[in-house]
Amino acid sequence: MTQSQHSQSPREALAERIVEAKTRKNLTFEQINEGTGLSVAFTTAALLGQHPLPADAARVVAAKLDLDDDAQRLLQTIPVRGSIPGGVPTDPTIYRFYEIVQVYGSTLKALIHEQFGDGIVSAINFKLDIKKVDDPEGGSRAVITLDGKYLPTKPF
């Protein structure tokens, strides 16, 4: 039976255990994800408390991280989502995304509405991909693809 959390606390505590085990075992999220059949972005979000994992995927990651049966079951529960309590994020990496939305949010909204009509881009029917590419001017660039299904507003 599908279970749902009513508080972020259990999944936050599990996320701490997961990061500690990942560090202790010197694993990458990609290595932990291998064999789950899921994208590394989805599995990472689940391990950090933002998604439930299917039972098979939970078994795979629990084995790699030496998590007990209770932790494995908890990974399968529907979490209370949202990882930025208290408003504006203070972590520099997360803040840059907040800044991107502050600068480009109205532009994204205008262009989405112009191209698709009144509606939203789903964060549920959604895919995320991150790639590291060489910058022709030196260094590296992060190519981040946000791929969400468009959902039109339906009058009622």
Curated annotation (Swiss-Prot):
Q: Carries keyword Zinc?
A: no
Recite the UniProt keywords alphabetically.
Lyase
Q: What class of enzyme is it?
A: lyase
Covalent S-S links between cysteines: none
Q: Which InterPro entries match?
A: Cyanase (IPR008076), Cyanate_lyase_C (IPR003712), Cyanate_lyase_C_sf (IPR036581), CYNS_N (IPR048564), Lambda_DNA-bd_dom_sf (IPR010982)
Choose any GO biological process term that the UniProt entry carries and state it.
cyanate metabolic process
Domain of life from the UniProt record: Bacteria
Lyase is among the record's keywords: yes
Catalysed reaction equations from the record: cyanate + hydrogencarbonate + 3 H(+) = NH4(+) + 2 CO2
GO MF term set = cyanate hydratase activity; DNA binding
What does the record give as EC number? 4.2.1.104
Q: Which residues form the active site?
A: 96, 99, 122
Pfam families in the cross-refs? Cyanate_lyase, CYNS_N
What's the stated role of this polypeptide? Catalyzes the reaction of cyanate with bicarbonate to produce ammonia and carbon dioxide.
| Family annotation (NCBIfam families) | cynS, PRK02866.1
Q: Would you identify the family this protein belongs to, as annotated?
A: Belongs to the cyanase family.
Question: What is the protein name given in its UniProt record?
Answer: Cyanate hydratase
